[in-house]
Structures are given as structure tokens and as C-alpha cells.
């Protein structure tokens, strides 16, 4: 309780200080934006409660999460593109019915984003320079894509002056209040850094000495992107991170831990080939290459396309896209990993194949059911 009280006080002071800063977008408000999109205040508060839970914060933070969204227009954001496909931006922006998370991102003062802005050429470069100078030490930097470093970064040149991505990433990072590597390419190098990596592409964290919060995924969920922004607005600090600098609230559990097909894994029921009877029954996809047991992410909870579905629900196994070097270490994507058999504490930490796990768990389940029956009979006799 004492820790929760301290966190609440910290967040309240942080939000109070942000409220005193003039809004960067004049004549706009969260209430007006929600009304224009037909979203009620009740739905907004439900979203705030859901976001609070997702961030692993106590339920008492829900009103503060809502307040954080309301003052998000005080937060200048600069979004840079490096070597990538723009899929992370598409994940956030392309929706036939934008959710509240997408709308919150629209509400934020996005000072620079090459995909969205009208300016180009010299004018675009002037806009970037102006935003960095105007909000020096205040802006949030989001970088999408790996950073080529070979030939002093000449494999990626951007804009009218031909600055390298390496130069731009270093310069923008130097003056940022917080830095987020959006997507696996920016977090870990991505496909650009896959063997043989001729451009010597590296993650953002390798080219700056500033702390970087990795938000991997190919692409990451829009909620994970916006959730990190909300956390920064609330506390002004980094969230609790794992060994790969990923927020634990989003990447603390494996895909396997929360998968809707987990029961079939435990029961030894596996898809043997795509399109077979097991596939039609929704059996576990481990034998056809699912990397869920090795991948840390919250896809099964958040899903994609306005919470419609996600790869495993659609019938294809996880490819481990939020893990470092997954292009080199997780393939072939439609085959189980012979070199990294699933490790489970149920068997004393020993590696097991899918077949062995299923058979052993079936045996354990039978023993458990028999024990339950015996205990039930004993209870009845006593009654």
C-alpha cells in the first residue's frame, strides 16, 4: 500500500506539472476528439481501466491514466524512419475503425513523421531541425527501423542533404527526453541485420549512449506503442525492463503462457501438417513450427486489427518476431526448432519434444483424475 501511495503521488505531481504546460495543439481536446469519433466518456474510461491493467498498475491508477491521455497533447514526438518497411507505423495508423489507442496517438503532438506529414525535401529537414531545437530535452523520440553503419552509414541516406540514417539517429537521440525503438528492426536490427548483414545494420541502442526502450514486434501492437507513451506521461521515467530492454508489462510472459491453444499442447494434441484434422480442431501448432514457447510478447491478449485476431488464432504458428535475431535463430518458421527443444520446469528443467511432453502430461492428467476421484469418494464417505 505504501508503494502504491508513493507511485500515485509521483504520477499526480507529474500530471500536474504537465497540465501547466500550454497545449501544443490549439483548440483541441480529448473530449472533442472522442465526440467526433462517436466514442463516449464511459468507453474512454473503460479504455483507461484496461490500459492501467495492461501497464500492470493498480486499479486506482485508472483516473490518472485517463488524465495522462488528456494531457498527451503536451508531449512533442519526433518519429524517425531508418531501414524498414513502415509496417510499425501502419500497425498504429491503418485501421478501418480506429480505436482509442490510435486516436490518442493522433492527439499527441507529432512534430515529425515522414509518412504522415505533407512537407518534403528541404522543408521536411527544416521541420525536423526546428522541432529538435524548439523542444530540446522535452521531446520523445521514436525510431522505426535498423540503422546501417557500414561505410559510415552510407547505405542509408535520407533527405535533400543526404544525411545518413546513422547521423540522424545519433543527433536526434542526443537531445531526447525518452527514446523508444519501435519494432524489431529498431530494437534488434531486424531483417536488415540478418546474416550476412552486408550493411552492418544495428539496433538503435548500438548507435547511441542514451537509454533506449525497445518495443519489438514485426509489427508491435498499437497498444504496446501507446502504452509506453502513457507510462512516460505518468511517471517521466523508464518502466521496469527485461534483459533486452523491453517493458516487462508487455514482454514479461511467453506467447505460450497465455495461448488459447495451450490446453491442446498440455494434452498432446498437435497439428501434424497445415490443413489436417488437428488444424481444423484448433490443436497446438508447435509441430508445424510455432515459436510461442521461446517468444515473449502479449499478442494473445491484445491481438491485431482492432483486437480481431492474431497469427495463432488465424492458424499459423508464432515466428518469434519480438526476439533478438529471430530471422537467423527461429527459422525455418514452419518447422520445430531441433536445436532448442522446449524447456519446462515440470520435468525438472529437462528438454522435451512435443510428443514427450504430451504423452507425459496425459499420464500425469490420468493420475490426477484418479486421485481426484479417490479424494471425492473419501469426502462422500465422511459426509
Where are these regions (language model features)?
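A conserved mid-domain beta-alpha-beta active-site/ligand-binding segment of alpha/beta enzyme cores
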Residues: 230, 234-303
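Local cysteine-cluster metal-coordination motifs and their immediate loop/turn environment
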Residues: 83-89, 184, 188, 260, ...
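Short cysteine/histidine-rich metal-coordination sites, predominantly Zn2+-binding motifs
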Residues: 277-278, 302-311, 332-342
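Juxtamembrane/start-of-transmembrane alpha-helix segments at the extracytoplasmic/lumenal side
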Residues: 347-360
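Extended, subdomain-level signal for the structured scaffold at the beginning of enzyme domains
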Residues: 45, 63-169, 368
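N-terminal export signals
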Residues: 43-65
Amino acid at each position: 500500500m505504501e508503494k502504491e501511495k508513493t507511485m500515485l503521488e509521483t504520477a499526480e505531481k507529474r500530471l500536474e506539472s504537465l497540465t501547466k504546460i500550454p497545449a501544443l495543439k490549439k483548440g483541441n481536446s480529448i473530449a472533442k476528439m472522442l465526440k467526433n469519433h462517436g466514442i463516449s466518456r464511459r468507453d474512454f474510461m473503460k479504455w483507461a481501466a484496461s490500459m492501467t491493467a495492461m501497464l500492470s498498475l493498480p486499479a486506482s491508477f485508472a483516473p490518472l491514466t485517463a488524465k495522462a491521455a488528456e494531457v498527451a497533447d503536451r508531449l512533442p514526438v519526433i518519429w524517425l524512419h531508418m531501414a524498414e518497411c513502415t509496417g510499425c507505423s501502419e500497425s498504429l495508423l491503418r485501421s478501418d475503425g480506429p480505436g482509442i489507442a490510435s486516436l490518442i496517438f493522433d492527439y499527441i503532438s507529432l512534430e515529425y513523421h515522414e509518412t504522415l506529414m505533407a512537407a518534403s525535401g528541404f522543408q521536411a529537414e527544416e521541420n525536423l531541425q526546428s522541432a529538435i531545437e524548439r523542444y530540446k530535452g522535452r521531446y520523445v523520440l521514436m525510431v522505426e527501423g535498423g540503422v546501417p553503419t557500414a561505410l559510415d552509414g552510407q547505405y542509408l541516406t535520407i533527405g535533400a542533404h543526404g544525411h545518413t540514417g546513422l547521423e540522424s539517429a545519433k543527433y536526434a537521440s542526443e537531445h531526447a527526453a525518452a527514446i523508444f525503438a519501435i519494432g524489431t528492426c529498431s530494437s534488434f536490427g531486424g531483417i536488415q541485420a540478418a546474416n550476412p548483414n552486408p550493411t552492418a545494420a544495428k539496433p538503435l541502442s548500438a548507435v547511441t549512449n542514451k537509454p533506449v526502450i525497445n518495443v519489438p514486434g514485426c509489427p508491435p501492437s498499437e497498444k504496446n506503442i501507446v502504452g509506453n507513451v502513457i507510462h512516460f506521461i505518468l511517471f517521466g521515467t523508464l518502466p521496469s525492463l527485461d534483459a533486452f530492454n523491453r517493458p516487462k508489462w508487455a514482454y514479461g510472459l511467453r506467447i505460450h503462457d497465455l495461448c488459447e491453444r495451450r490446453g491442446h499442447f498440455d494434452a498432446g494434441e498437435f497439428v501434424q501438417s497445415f490443413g489436417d484434422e488437428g488444424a481444423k480442431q484448433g490443436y497446438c501448432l508447435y509441430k508445424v513450427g510455432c515459436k510461442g514457447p521461446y517468444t515473449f510478447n502479449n499478442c494473445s491478449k491484445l491481438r491485431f486489427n482492432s483486437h480481431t485476431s492474431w497469427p495463432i488464432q488465424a492458424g499459423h504458428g508464432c515466428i518469434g518476431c519480438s526476439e533478438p535475431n529471430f530471422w537467423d535463430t527461429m527459422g525455418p518458421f514452419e518447422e520445430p526448432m531441433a536445436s532448442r527443444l522446449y524447456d519446462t520446469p515440470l520435468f525438472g528443467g529437462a528438454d522435451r519434444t512435443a510428443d514427450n511432453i504430451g504423452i507425459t502430461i496425459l499420464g500425469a492428467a490420468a493420475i490426477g483424475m484418479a486421485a481426484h476421484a479417490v479424494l471425492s469418494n473419501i469426502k462422500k464417505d465422511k459426509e
